[in-house]
């Protein structure tokens, strides 16, 4: 949890760098920076991602943000501004963390895809197909999920009704 731990607080960048060095020493070149506790904030995410992207250019990075405090989307945008391109998401925002009190799931796939679409960032993913899967997930679970897009719909749908 490089963005913050419920037990250790903020983790110094030097400790994170040491862990990354240890991974590289044994041949690991794909590394995920996870915010399972949902403690990360955009300026911290930007600074850390900029740092590791520059210091460790051979690493293939993944980012993993839980939306516990409602800032996962902003954290993704900050990471993208720092050059990161891969993010874990989940249908409907499912998930959680059994050892972090109150932890929400990952940010919903459809919310992130919609944000990218509306921002002109090509993902190659059909947001409506993802929404259909997330609706099926809700049906299977028997309750709503944390997807904003399933509640509000695509911006383009709203714009069509205004015209």
Question: Where does each model-flagged region fall?
Answer:
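Catalytic cores and adjacent flexible loops of soluble metabolic enzymes
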Residues: 1-163
